[in-house]
C-alpha cells in the first residue's frame, strides 16, 4: 500500500473513533437527563398527608407547598 492509502485509512479510523465517542457522550447525557426527570417527579409528587387531604377535597393532586400553603392542581408539573 502506498503512503497515501495508509494516511486515508488512518484518517477514516480517527473519524470513526471520534464519532463513536460523541455518540457515547450524547447517550450518557440523555441517560443523565432521564434520571434527573425521575428524581424531580418523585420529589414533587411526594406530599404530606395534610396537603393530600386538602387537595383531595377539591378533586385535585397535591403538588407540594408554596409559602407553607398546599398547592393543588389537576396535573403537577416539575
From Swiss-Prot:
The disulfides recorded in the entry are: 51-63, 55-72, 62-76
Q: Where in the cell is it found?
A: Secreted
Main location, first listed in the record: secreted
Phenylalanine amide modifications at:
77
Q: Which family does it belong to?
A: Belongs to the conotoxin O3 superfamily.
Q: Which InterPro entries match?
A: Conotoxin (IPR004214)
Protein name in the entry? Conotoxin TsMSGL-13
Q: Name one GO molecular function term.
A: toxin activity
The organism named in the record is Conus tessulatus (Tessellate cone)
Write out the domain note. The presence of a 'disulfide through disulfide knot' structurally defines this protein as a knottin.
Q: Name one GO cellular component term.
A: extracellular region
Signal peptide range: 1-24
Expressed, tissue-wise, as follows: Expressed by the venom duct.
**Pro-piece positions:** 25-44
Question: Which UniProt keyword terms apply here?
Answer: Amidation, Cleavage on pair of basic residues, Disulfide bond, Knottin, Neurotoxin, Secreted, Signal, Toxin
Q: Does the keyword Signal apply?
A: yes
Amino acid at each position: 500500500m502506498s503512503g497515501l492509502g495508509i494516511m486515508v485509512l488512518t484518517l477514516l479510523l480517527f473519524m470513526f473513533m471520534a464519532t463513536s465517542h460523541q455518540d457515547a457522550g450524547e447517550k450518557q447525557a440523555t441517560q443523565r437527563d432521564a434520571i434527573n426527570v425521575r428524581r424531580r417527579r418523585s420529589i414533587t409528587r411526594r406530599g404530606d398527608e395534610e396537603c393530600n387531604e386538602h387537595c383531595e377535597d377539591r378533586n385535585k393532586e397535591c403538588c407540594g407547598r408554596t409559602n407553607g400553603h398546599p398547592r393543588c392542581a389537576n396535573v403537577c408539573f416539575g
